[in-house]
Amino acid sequence: MVRISKPKTFQAYLDDCHRRYSCAHCRAHLANHDDLISKSFQGSQGRAYLFNSVVNVGCGPAEERVLLTGLHAVADIHCENCKTTLGWKYEQAFESSQKYKEGKYIIELNHMIKDNGWD
């Protein structure tokens, strides 16, 4: 018997005319390049990017962690399609110089790929 697999469907698709980042494990769209804030972040497993907004991402419960820039309340984020942990969301920053991170998302480079329009 031959099994025919259904094509993957994601909760949200980003516009094809924009450069975007996708999950390295399942190719679910994650973020537009226009939402990239900084490439100068460090994740738990290496370099990471800070984004203003993301799609197809679920959020775990917030917890306090001491990161390189001080104490923050963060929630792990995962790909809604393949459930891979991608990084975290900054829920609260306790130092005034770090407040700009609140509501923003860290995605580690080893969990995303550049997709569409990167010539």
UniProtKB/Swiss-Prot annotation:
Transmembrane segments: none
Binding site for Zn(2+): C23, C26, C79, C82
GO molecular-function term, one example from the UniProt record: metal ion binding
Posttranslational mods: Probably ubiquitinated leading to its degradation by the proteasome.
Pfam families: Yippee-Mis18
Example of a GO cellular component annotation carried by this entry: nucleolus
Annotated Yippee domain residues: 19-116
UniProt note on tissues of expression: Widely expressed. Strongly expressed in heart, brain, testis, lung, spleen, liver, kidney and myeloid cells.
InterPro entries: Yippee, Yippee/Mis18/Cereblon, Yippee_fam
PROSITE patterns xref list: YIPPEE (PS51792)
Chief place of localization: nucleus
One GO process term, biological-process aspect: apoptotic process
Swiss-Prot/TrEMBL keywords: Apoptosis, Metal-binding, Nucleus, Ubl conjugation, Zinc
Location(s), subcellular: Nucleus, Nucleolus
Induction: Up-regulated after the removal of interleukin 3 and exposure to granulocyte colony stimulating factor.
Coiled-coil region: none
Family of this protein: Belongs to the yippee family.
Role summary: Involved in proliferation and apoptosis in myeloid precursor cells.
Protein name, entry field: Protein yippee-like 3
Organism: Mus musculus (Mouse)
